Amino acid sequence: NNMYLIDYHIHSNNSFDSKETVLSVCKAAIEKGIKEICFTEHFSVKEGIKSYGFLNLKKYSDEIKECREIFKDKLTIRAGIEICEPHENEEELRLILENIPFDFILGSVHNFDYNIGLAAYMSTHSKKESYSRYFEEVNKVCTSPYIDVVAHLDLMKRYAFNTHGNYDFNDYKEKIEEVLKNIIKSGKGIEVNTSTLRGMVNETMPSNDILKMYYDLGGEIITVGSDAHKVEDVGADIKESIEVLKNIGFKNIYKFKNRQAIPVEI
């Protein structure tokens, strides 16, 4: 079994919510038989949210360079970021990003109306309002020129699970279809995020229903990521998720270099 295992959603202590070093993540990846990883550190130009001003680009790029030297034959290391609500500050992002050679950029929705967190929003809104609003926002993210892939497309369920429960795919089918069509039309992709397999939700983000719909609509670009914030989660459920994609009909997953999508046969 020589599957080329890739983990394209990982956080180190270059993100506000992880304590792991780039070095320890790389070691863990090699131990687990992962061949290529991409760090996707939280990044935001929005004041008032936790990731604002946290990423030190000099530290980050120095650590990536150092680890590329150390592990050059054993592991391919890519440098990326995960941008919160990239549709809200396009001009600022443009000025920063046109000078930084990232390999890969994820776009995600963690807040509404600039800085209202998903959980906070949900505490004062119904299940239907919360999920509808979430998919509306994701629909705005997917056309941003500053992202390559939309992260955890149905993330809302992670926050909603305890209080509102998971959503029924059929209730949001039209909206999700619109989102996926926009992603495809704008040349972007989606990811399979395995982090919710490690919690109570017990399915990937997005669900298999969304993955199938993406395939049926002609979607091709898809990455797989653990969303690890701890070394023990690096590479978690990647192999299984690739099998799921294969069974749906996907022929490739994707890796990135200099923000160009590169297919990897599965």
For each predicted feature, which ranges?
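Conserved residues at the C-terminal ends of beta-strands
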Residues: T40, S108, L153, N193, ...
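Charged catalytic cores and adjacent phosphate/nucleic-acid-binding surfaces used
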Residues: N1-S12, V22, T163-I266
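Alpha-helical scaffolding within the catalytic cores
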Residues: V25, E91-L93, S207-N208
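Flexible, active-site-proximal loop/turn residues at the rims of small-molecule/cofactor binding pockets
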Residues: F43, N111, M156, T196, ...
